[in-house]
């Protein structure tokens, strides 16, 4: 039996992303922007290039999302003290309150999808998925930087 694990992972990711996009729309968040807001909260002062790397998305997409979050008053940019071209990202009070709601939704969704798995299985799954994520991220960076995969 050939298992298509990537298809399963994709189905899970799309379902949860779709739910989040529906629920977060009323909070002034467009598609996927909740990811950016939470990562900025987790990494105060992060720069956009590093944020793009964490999320495995291109810089242009990141810049658009940052602009929308800033326009909605959820984040702010602050100049670097040594290099004015570098902008550090921080959540505002409004953004922090919204990020708290997003984190609650994330905890709820985690519990929901892990229903029926005991703690040992949850830890095993987390370890396996971390390896899959690391492999995917490594390949993403390789291809993004001009590498050619041989399949």
Kindly give the residue locations of the regions a language model identified.
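Key DNA-contact positions within bacterial/archaeal DNA-binding proteins
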Residues: 32-34, 60
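Pre-recognition alpha-helix immediately N-terminal to the DNA-recognition helix
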Residues: 15, 19, 35-38, 97, ...
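Residues within helix-turn-helix
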Residues: 48-49, 60, 67, 87
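Short, locally clustered residues in the helix-turn-helix/winged-helix DNA-binding domain
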Residues: 10, 38-42, 103, 130
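C-terminal regulatory/oligomerization modules of transcriptional regulators
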Residues: 120-151
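Charged, amphipathic alpha-helical coiled-coil/dimerization segments
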Residues: 67-130
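Short capping segments at the starts of secondary-structure elements
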Residues: 43-47
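N-terminal leader segment of winged-helix/HTH proteins
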Residues: 1-27, 74, 143, 150-151
């Amino acid at each position: 039996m050939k298992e298509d694990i990537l298809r399963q992972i994709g189905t899970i990711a799309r379902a949860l992303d779709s739910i989040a996009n529906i629920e977060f729309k009323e909070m002034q968040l467009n598609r996927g922007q909740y990811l950016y807001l939470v990562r900025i909260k987790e990494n105060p002062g992060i720069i956009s290039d590093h944020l793009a790397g964490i999320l495995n998305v291109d810089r242009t997409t990141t810049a658009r999302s940052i602009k929308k979050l800033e326009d909605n008053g959820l984040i702010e940019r602050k100049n670097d003290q040594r290099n004015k071209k570098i902008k550090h990202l921080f959540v505002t009070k409004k953004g922090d309150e919204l990020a708290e709601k997003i984190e609650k939704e994330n905890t709820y969704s985690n519990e929901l999808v892990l229903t029926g798995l005991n703690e040992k299985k949850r830890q095993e799954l987390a370890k396996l998925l971390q390896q899959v994520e690391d492999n995917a991220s490594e390949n993403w960076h390789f291809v993004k930087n001009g590498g050619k995969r041989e399949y």
